[in-house]
A protein has these predicted regions:
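Carbohydrate-active catalytic/glycan-binding domains of CAZyme proteins
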Residues: 21-346
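Bacterial Sec-dependent N-terminal signal peptides
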Residues: 1-34
Length: 346
């Protein structure tokens, strides 16, 4: 009798294990798994639903990364179906698994604030100022009820990586319209604001003040080609700038410019995307290029595949940057991992 009981218990344990595995597999396939399998799920799947470590869909659009204390921090737009809900921040040690940290910058309840509920905050980027020991956030701001006519840069500050950030001000840099934007800190610690201006016809760059809170008068037009979504990075002494065309939420062809100095001259060298649907940036739009810590000459291209009917459901396209004769390109991959940085030819 004991022998039969042991056999029955063994069969029951096996049946429970198989059932549990099948249920977990189904949950993962359906995007309903409450946790991520951190032992096995080490790959990027561009355009697929991406959940955080709590099983919630990551909500950080038009964003950028900051690497600090051996951790990556991802700042991006918190979006409802259409509403702008502030700026979220996530953290990760490996770039695959992201923990939600906080709503780093919230819309204000003060009806006189530039960032009161109903405003639009887009493309947030955060940099660290070593002199002031402050984290500084810049973003594209549109005032409540003004459509896209305000065209301002917003600035916020925090003592902590995860915030909360305190909104300081919004303005037009040197009187120029400022829409899609990015930040870049050069090797000497000087920071720059790259932004679309004059109804997006001009791409401009302005050097920031030492505290990173304002622009200086060193502000110049890089080129006038009706571009937006700037993503700037540096490699082997050259500066590279990836931008998109201006077609609303619809994807379009990316463009690559190269320069020896940030203020130019900048040379246009074509579309850096290759592979299926490259002429539409794989259905996405550039937002940031991140150097990969611990890997030589490794860069991550970040883009958003916008869903204008439900902005919260816009997907993320993360792909490795490759180089040929010092000219970067981004090739489509359905799935990849960080080992690709070791095998691609830079």
């Amino acid at each position: 009798m004991k022998k039969y009981n042991l056999i029955n218990k063994f069969i029951l344990i096996v049946w429970i294990s198989i059932t549990s595995c099948n249920a977990q597999r189904t949950a993962i396939e359906n995007g309903t798994a409450s946790t991520v399998n951190e032992k096995n799920d080490f790959s990027f799947k561009p355009g697929e639903i991406w959940n955080d470590t709590e099983g919630n869909v990551i909500n950080a659009h038009g964003g950028g990364l900051l690497f600090k204390n051996n951790t990556y921090y991802w700042y991006g737009e918190a979006r409802g179906k259409t509403a702008s809900q502030g700026v979220n921040v996530y953290s990760s040690k490996d770039l695959y698994h992201w923990k939600f940290e906080a709503l780093a910058l919230s819309p204000a309840t003060d009806t006189l604030s530039d960032i009161r509920m109903g405003c639009v905050m887009e493309r947030p980027k955060v940099i660290y100022n070593k002199k002031t020991k402050k984290y500084v956030m810049w973003f594209h701001l549109e005032l409540k009820g003004k459509g896209y006519s305000a065209a301002r840069a917003g600035v916020a500050i925090s003592d902590r990586l995860t915030g909360p950030f305190t909104f300081l001000k919004s303005f037009r840099p040197n009187g120029n319209m400022s829409r899609d934007m990015n930040l870049f800190v050069d090797e000497d610690g000087t920071a720059y604001h790259i932004y679309s201006s004059r109804e997006n016809y001009d791409m401009r760059i302005a050097q920031l003040t030492d505290d990173y809170l304002s622009v200086t008068t060193k502000d110049s037009m890089l080129f006038s080609e009706h571009r937006e979504a700037p993503a700037l990075f540096k490699y082997q002494g050259n500066y590279y700038l990836i931008t998109s065309g201006c077609t609303g939420w619809a994807p379009n062809k990316a463009s690559l410019h190269i320069a020896k100095t940030l203020f130019g001259p900048w040379k246009q060298v074509g579309d850096p995307m290759t592979g299926p649907d490259a002429e539409h940036t794989f259905g996405g739009q550039s937002t940031y290029v991140q150097p990969i810590a611990g890997k030589k000459n490794a860069f991550l291209f970040m883009a958003d595949r916008w869903n204008p009917k439900n902005l919260k459901d816009s997907r993320y396209l993360w792909l490795p940057v490759q180089f040929k004769n010092d000219v970067p390109f981004v090739n489509w991959m359905n799935e990849w991992n960080k080992n690709s940085f070791d095998t691609i030819s830079n």
